[in-house]
UniProtKB/Swiss-Prot annotation:
Pathway: Carbohydrate degradation; glycolysis; pyruvate from D-glyceraldehyde 3-phosphate: step 3/5. It comes from the Bacteria. Monomer. It is an enzyme of class 5 (isomerase). It comes from Vibrio atlanticus (strain LGP32) (Vibrio splendidus (strain Mel32)). This is 2,3-bisphosphoglycerate-independent phosphoglycerate mutase. Belongs to the BPG-independent phosphoglycerate mutase family. GO terms for cellular component: cytosol. CDD domains: iPGM. HAMAP family: GpmI. One of its GO terms (molecular function) is manganese ion binding. The active site is at 63 (phosphoserine intermediate). InterPro entries: Alkaline_phosphatase_core_sf, BPG-indep_PGM_N, Metalloenzyme, PGAM_B_sf, Pgm_bpd_ind.
């Protein structure tokens, strides 16, 4: 059997294009390989944000959204827009799972706990949704409404939570009931890399009020964290209660609503509330009604307010139906993105699909190791390309995003330079295998390391375009105006495979 000539897609997570070189880790890095590709290979810029990926106009893209759109080959209406629309239409307050959980707690005079990432960032959650959930609980008669605030500082400026917390303090004052009950940074509450010691700190705060600090108000707790030099993301467990108030812990009979809609960083803390769990020893395990805003994983047996819409004939599924073989490969931080999200929210492999996982380094923050596990990932990717086993390969390099999120400029430059070295080996392997390669990104990040308006560190994604570069055995010219959802139909076309009718994206090669 002759060796296959693979179609490889390499996604440089967080690698956006920005004309201004100021504080631009991508433009200022030494990248001879990428420079040569841009000079000599077909390339263009494509959109990875806003309406083009099913988000509100102007909203920055993110990894979940990006990979879902790439894999689907069509613009996918995202959870953010779907839930926002349900609030505007008045349907949110009638959502069965939410209504049932709140009503059950109210009936027996129990508390409604609402937790989630308190941020206007729109990547994992949106504070407007949390606001609507508080209003809904109050409207249905809940007297004890406790808000557990996970703080952002990653998809938002590092110290930007005060306005959000003040907004909710005003809401509770207006309602005359409820309060912010706890604060903790997303570093602890939203881990996704099996750092169970961090997750346990969040769980113990929620269920036992186990906290290093206690303050009368959320804003006071936040100000104290800043005084300790903790940015929003890293705020340590803080209980919020005034003198004479009881701790607002989760106990038997309560309702818990988790208002994050993005799955990957919601799973670990959610699993801690499921009976079958071995991440850490739980001192208490309350019998509660727990509602996930969206489905975080198919094997989590909890209520879900907005079940996933089914996506048929994604790139991976279509390749499988066509009898093709495919490989998905990344390191831990983005493994879910090239598998679960790329497959339209489906956990299981398709027939003919294989997966390889490279462990992300165990460091506190990735500025400490900006190359992450890229060398090992590259070694495996090159072997897969040369091995002749796969018709299609999808690989994600997380570096520009994960290091970009730290806000450490010099580390981000090193991340880009390490990727460039790796790409040289990948390009060489593709040419040797007489295959085809598309290099792109799911969203921007490392091209803006300082906020040009405030002068502060910029740790969030951007809404800037991303590159698309072709390397291969075909004479290719790109059309202008492409977007992420055009990649799957374009790859199928370049591979000589029919495009399923469900893929409404355009073929952007002439």
């Amino acid at each position: 059997m002759s060796a296959k000539k693979p179609m490889a897609l390499v996604i440089l997570d967080g690698y956006g294009y920005r004309e201004d070189n100021q504080d631009n880790a991508i433009a200022n890095a030494k990248t001879p390989v990428l420079d040569g590709l841009i000079a000599n290979q077909p390339n263009t810029l494509i959109s990875a944000s806003g309406l083009d990926v099913g988000l509100p106009d102007g909203q920055m893209g993110n990894s979940e959204v990006g990979h879902t759109n790439i894999g689907a080959g069509r613009v996918v209406y995202q959870d953010l827009t779907r839930i926002t629309k349900s609030i505007a239409d008045g349907e949110f307050g009638q959502t069965e799972a939410l209504v049932n959980a709140v009503d059950k707690a109210v009936k027996v005079d129990k508390a409604v706990h609402i937790m989630g990432l308190m941020s206007p960032g729109g990547v994992h959650s949106h504070e407007d949704h949390i606001y609507a959930a508080v209003e809904m609980a109050a409207a249905r008669g809940a007297e004890k409404i406790y808000l557990h605030a996970f703080l952002d500082g990653r998809d938002t400026p590092p110290r930007s939570a005060e306005n959000t917390l003040a907004r909710f303090q005003e809401l509770f004052a207006k309602l005359g009931k409820g309060r912010v009950a706890s604060l903790i940074g997303r570093y602890y509450a939203m881990d996704r890399d099996n750092n169970w010691d961090r997750v346990q700190e969040s769980y113990d705060l929620l269920t036992q009020a186990k906290a290093e600090f206690t303050f009368d108000t959320a804003v006071a707790g936040l100000e104290a964290a800043y005084a300790r030099d903790e940015n929003d993301e890293f705020v340590k467990a803080t209980e919020i209660k005034a003198e004479g108030e009881e701790s607002a812990v989760i106990v038997d009979g309560d309702a818990v609503i988790f208002m994050n809609y993005r799955a990957d960083r919601a799973r670990e803390i959610t699993r801690a509330f499921v009976p079958d769990f071995d991440g850490f020893a739980r001192n208490v395990f309350p019998a509660i009604d727990f509602v996930m805003l969206t489905q975080y994983a198919a094997d989590i047996p909890l209520l879900c307010a907005f079940p996933p819409a089914s996506l048929e004939n994604t790139y991976g599924e279509w390749l499988s139906k066509e009898g093709k073989t495919q490989l998905r490969i990344s390191e831990t931080e983005k493994y879910a993105h090239v598998t679960f999200f790329f497959n339209g929210g489906k956990e299981d492999e398709f027939e003919g699909e294989e997966r390889q996982l490279v462990a992300s380094p165990k460091v506190a923050t990735y500025d400490l190791q900006p190359e992450m596990s890229a060398p090992e990932l590259t070694e495996k990717l090159v072997a897969a390309i040369k091995g002749g086993k796969y018709d299609a390969i999808v690989c994600n390099f997380p570096n520009c995003d994960m290091v970009g999120h730290t806000g450490v400029y010099d580390a981000a430059v090193k991340a880009v330079e390490s990727l460039d070295e790796c790409l040289g080996k990948v390009v060489e392997a593709i040419k040797e295998a007489d295959g085809q390669l598309l290099i792109t990104a799911d969203h921007g990040n490392a091209e803006m390391m300082v906020n040009p308006e405030t002068g502060g560190i910029h740790t969030a994604h951007t809404n800037l375009p991303v590159p698309l570069i072709y390397v291969g055995n075909k004479d290719v010219e790109f059309k202008e105006g492409g977007k992420l959802s055009d990649l799957a139909p374009t790859m199928l076309s370049l591979s000589g495979i029919d495009i399923p009718v469900e893929m409404s994206g355009d073929v952007i090669v002439k």
